[in-house]
């Protein structure tokens, strides 16, 4: 770690009551931990840039579980071992939790150094780098799209030509579909390259963070699913399969999820075997794996990507609603070394539907109360308000809100969520065409 990445400060010690260290600031994870841990139990580590950009010091005051926030070079992945020079092992520490994608490596390194359960540094580094993950999957024979490293737009054009005029371009170390572009024969590779290589998350990433790397992949056809698996000592325990709906067009952003997916038993067995193989080839030890797959011919899993952290898009809440219990609590149990989490039976189904809106400036949003009153609706959330300018949805961060609903089965839950979402209307001061 260069001196410019160090965060000087007199404190190497956490507050006496700290039992859990969170690598990365996440309001969602902290809200869960407020319910699961006593006040003052959590120390949050994050980049100085991110702490400032997100107003984390002020926002943390709303979370009783937070003992403090410490600035640290959590995203300096090549030198993550130096995090141990910043912070002494808290005497009562029970777990280190990666709260965000960019904290996965730092959390794994701290857990390993402190003798606590974690992903393992090597596994974390593989799973944070889509190129490394693709290479590991190729070496094991795990089914996945054909792929290549892309260093120029010419690489994209050549790959597309070799694969029937279709491909997917993506960053190797981002999240939330940020920068991902789906290309057909007539789509501009130059425009896609410009979009992909300039996509960033300045609110979430340090200014010095690793430079972008890119890969281009074969486009596969078939339903998309994700698998959320709790792993203990390299063994897969509780597992859920989530069905996904992805918006059409060049930006494949997820617009809905259903838990559980309700697949045929044979397909579920194939996915389970693929996840076990993914655990084996990465050497993943303790935590949660959120892996995404395309079912070619609706039955053959092909790996798309995998994250070694809690899933986003409220999938953890959908799991809670469909199975009972607390998925985040089970995750803590694994990271605290309290043993494996066994499979359990579903008791219903849950679905999330993300809202869509015209592009332009919002004048008024109506229908929220009507949507909330529908049977089975559990949550209606808006992420925009009057005066907000809405752009096209190009990543998970640009969706204007969502609805969550429950029902006895997945089809009904999805229908209820869609019906509620249809009642919410965005009135615009002016609708605008977007370049």
Regions from the language model: what does each represent?
Residues 1-123, 154, 339, 357, ...:
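ATP-binding N-terminal substructure of ATP-dependent carboxylate-amine bond-forming enzymes
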Residues 137, 160-182, 201-222, 227, ...:
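ATP-grasp fold ATP-binding core
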Residues 289, 371-390:
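A structural supersecondary motif
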